[in-house]
């Protein structure tokens, strides 16, 4: 087994390598003067079980091309099996046609990764579970809920006062999975999105007065949904609001927006390498998925079941 990484999340890749007790593979990913991406594998991989860790986060297209070119390089270097480990799968929010004459970009990206020569995909908290079916190869979609649950139990001494909140109807399944971990109540924020990047909170379904609310979602981008949801929960009597989000996209002015919000804390994973601005934010904290991803890689390499990681 050999683990390699592109440029999108070297910090996570190094942490995963430490968990696996193996060195990170030697590969050069650089650009020519015209910005074309060039990859050179600097060690023998013939007959090896190769894992490439690369989130397709901002700049999404550059990191996607890095991944595709790395897959091609390993295929042409006679690797026995190639697994793409994609903690954050870009284009996942384009999983269906929202209107006429529009693409299903998530399916296109899945096709590109498959055609490049990968044998298996390992990812985390896909925005829509059906994206697994976009791949014609084995695909494991891990869940960050176990990592979040451990953090919640360490943070809150009185779990009986915790309510898990889904910021919209679509995230109820994810929120329920966390709530079951410590037998917490569930609430839902019913909102209406007026235009892209903005949301209007309408009402709260569930009892939140006097409770510590945990907002659970897969992606935080502009931060508007979270901030509006926090305002609505506090207006309905919540004692505090903390958000647990898997993928911290945090584009534009999101960090400043969240820093100035009523959120007690935003907890994100390192599926996307955090910027210095994120690390310096007073109410944003990063928890690591390195052990989860490392264990999944180890079990995949040894042909063991990964199903227990979903529990």
UniProtKB/Swiss-Prot annotation:
Swiss-Prot/TrEMBL keywords: ATP-binding, Cytoplasm, Kinase, Magnesium, Metal-binding, Nucleotide biosynthesis, Nucleotide-binding, Transferase
Annotated SMART domains: Pribosyltran_N (SM01400)
Originating species: Mesorhizobium japonicum (strain LMG 29417 / CECT 9101 / MAFF 303099)
Keyword Metal-binding appears in the UniProt entry: yes
Record pathway: Metabolic intermediate biosynthesis; 5-phospho-alpha-D-ribose 1-diphosphate biosynthesis; 5-phospho-alpha-D-ribose 1-diphosphate from D-ribose 5-phosphate (route I): step 1/1
Binding site for ATP: 34-36, 93-94
Biological processes per GO annotation: 5-phosphoribose 1-diphosphate biosynthetic process; purine nucleotide biosynthetic process; ribonucleoside monophosphate biosynthetic process
Protein name: Ribose-phosphate pyrophosphokinase
PROSITE patterns cross-referenced by the UniProt entry: PRPP_SYNTHASE
Family listed: Belongs to the ribose-phosphate pyrophosphokinase family. Class I subfamily.
